[in-house]
């Protein structure tokens, strides 16, 4: 009986782990510092000084298919159009931190 109970418990734990949404082990506070030093000159307050219609506000991120950590990480890493790539300047974990910060701020309307 104990063996069956242990197996059931293990199965539940594995199922929960396998189907839980993948969370970034990101440091939002560090992301805020990195954003301030590297991104705020063009994106202060979630705005976009180069392409005004493509802000970092939640509705614009959703509209342009950028409302996910993966999309933001790809954009910051590789750059696009006027936005430079940060691949050589920031480490992958720093870019993850920035993505977590941007998504958190977007959820709070950058307030």
From Swiss-Prot:
The keyword Protein transport does not apply. Keywords: Electron transport, Heme, Iron, Metal-binding, Photosynthesis, Signal, Thylakoid, Transport. Pfam families: Cytochrome_CBB3. Gene3D superfamilies: Cytochrome c-like domain. PROSITE patterns: CYTC. Belongs to the cytochrome c family. PetJ subfamily. Heme c binds at residues 39, 42-43, 83. This is Cytochrome c6. Binds 1 heme c group covalently per subunit. Functions as an electron carrier between membrane-bound cytochrome b6-f and photosystem I in oxygenic photosynthesis. InterPro entries: Cyt_c-like_dom (IPR009056), Cyt_c-like_dom_sf (IPR036909), Cyt_C6 (IPR023655), Cyt_C_IC (IPR008168). Residues 1-26 form the signal peptide.
